[in-house]
């Protein structure tokens, strides 16, 4: 079972709210969030209610100055616990240079710290997650905006929540939850 604690002040001070399940609307529980402690599991937190807006992946650990380390201006508005069995088994991802799974395709079984080095493009317009869960990052070396991809077909970049096709890196969510 997962457990995440949101604190109103930095360094785990002030009023706190503990959560062990998905929560589509955190706003009634605290006024601000300046630090987070993940005691169990892996979580995606979202900048807007109902799992909308920018996403941020948090694994077990402490985030004493949450807004600074995540580059956020606002408190998280919703949170989702990722499965404890996430990433067990194989991981397979196909990426495409054009929408609707068209154009040049590459298949990945491992993390990719720099998409351009492997795919010769900064853009992925569609993809198919065949096995496992993956996180796309806007910038190389696992930085920038994050997008969680579950198994399934993503016909265009908007399907995974992005406003652009720019993907700088991606990694498997494996063995860390």
Swiss-Prot record:
SMART domains in alphabetical order: XTALbg
Annotated region (Connecting peptide) at: 84-90
Which SUPFAM superfamilies does the annotation name?
gamma-Crystallin-like
Alphabetic keyword roster:
Eye lens protein, Repeat
Q: Does the keyword Transferase apply?
A: no
Q: Does the keyword Repeat apply?
A: yes
Q: List each copy of the Beta/gamma crystallin 'Greek key' domain by range.
A: 2-40, 41-83, 91-131, 132-174
Instruction: Kindly give the InterPro entries that the UniProt entry links to this protein.
Output: Beta/Gamma-Crystallin, Beta/gamma_crystallin, G_crystallin-like
So where does this one cross the membrane? none
- Which Gene Ontology BP annotations are present? lens development in camera-type eye; visual perception
A single Gene Ontology MF term assigned here is: structural constituent of eye lens
Q: What does this protein do?
A: Crystallins are the dominant structural components of the vertebrate eye lens.
Q: Record's domain comment?
A: Has a two-domain beta-structure, folded into four very similar Greek key motifs.
Q: PANTHER family of this UniProt entry? A: BETA/GAMMA CRYSTALLIN, GAMMA-CRYSTALLIN D
How it assembles, according to the record, is: Monomer.
> What family does the entry list?
Belongs to the beta/gamma-crystallin family.
Protein name according to UniProt: Gamma-crystallin M1-2
Q: Which organism is it from?
A: Aquarana catesbeiana (American bullfrog)
